Each structure stands twice: as C-alpha cells, then as structure tokens.
Amino acid sequence: MAAAKAEFTEHGLAGARLNRIAINAKASKERLYSYFESKERLFEAVVAQWISDAPYQVPLSAEDVPGYVAGLFDNIVADPQGARLQRWIELEAPDGMFDNHLLRRIFQAKLDEVRRGQQCGLIDPAWDPKSLLMLLIDIAYSMAASGFSIDRIVGEPLSERTLADRRNAAAEAARRLVGVS
C-alpha cells in the first residue's frame, strides 16, 4: 500500500501506473490486478487506509471552529503527502467512490456540527454548511501548503515563525468567517 500511496500522491489516479507500483512494491502487476481488480479499486483502498490511519480526522466543534482550522493546518504541515493525496481525491475520485464510505461519514458529522452551531448561535446561519466547511478546509490548506510554494517563489526559507504566523492567520480567518453578525 505504501508504494501505491506514493504513486497516487505523485501522479494522481489518471497518471498513476500499476507497473510502477508493482516495481516499487516488489510485486507483480498481475497480482495487484487479481487482488484489486482495477487501478480505481486500488486507489479506493489507498484512500480508505489513509483516512482510517490519518490524524487528518480533526474533530470539528462548533464551540472552537478556529481550533479545527488550526488542527487541520498542523496535520497538513505534518503530512504533506496526505495533503497532496487529498487534492488528488478531490480532483479525480471516481463516481460512486464515496457511497457508504468512511469519508462520507466523517464529513456528514462535520456538517451536522456546523448545523448545530448555527442553531445554537455559534456560527453565522447565513452560511450554507457545505460551503462553509469547504472554506474552512481550504483556509487551512491554503495557509499550510500553498504558502510553501510562495516562499519558494520569492526565495525565502520557511521558518517556524512563518508557520506560526500562518497558523494563527488561518485560525483568525476562521473565527471571522463563522462570526455571528
């Protein structure tokens, strides 16, 4: 599974090649096909393992939405390979992949918590819960992952201070976003 995760993280579902996975896993391509049936099924297995193993399952509490975003930020910084895999999932997940899937249950629980927060007056009810959740996730991702690219473009080394500032900015953006007007 490690070879498959590395391949999908690097190339996505469309660009991944079972022959490279087989070589890196020291297995035969035929054996992979016999076990997983298709590249899509192998991708689904990699995603399922990553979701169940990942510390990415940061709990969302309506009482501490900034803490949720800060926790996501921390996990993205700690596991850039997982963050990259998440983006490939968003871009290339096959139709039906999430039927009865752990990821669906995780996100449904987060949406339920957003709705609870809206009902309790902790989160601005003007937001569509799905749109708000996507924004919160993308704030964490943008500040954690995209910032690395900006630092490289402008030729500045990434410091602990910069990471702390970005984490704080992400949490503050979340606080302002959910504020009740």
Describe these PLM feature segments.
Residues 3-41, 45:
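Helix-turn-helix
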Residues 10, 44-71:
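Amphipathic alpha-helical linker/stalk segments
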Residues 10-14, 79, 120:
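Short coil/turn segments at alpha/beta junctions that flank glycine-rich nucleotide-binding fingerprints
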Residues 19-20, 35, 39-40, 49-54, ...:
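Ligand-binding pocket scaffold of soluble enzyme catalytic domains
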Residues 55, 59, 95-120, 130-134:
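Amphipathic alpha-helical packing segments from all-alpha helical-bundle domains
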Residues 66-90, 95-98, 137-148, 179-180:
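Helical hydrophobic small-molecule/effector-binding pocket
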Residues 74-78, 108, 112-120, 138-139, ...:
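C-terminal peripheral helix-coil segments that are non-catalytic and often amphipathic
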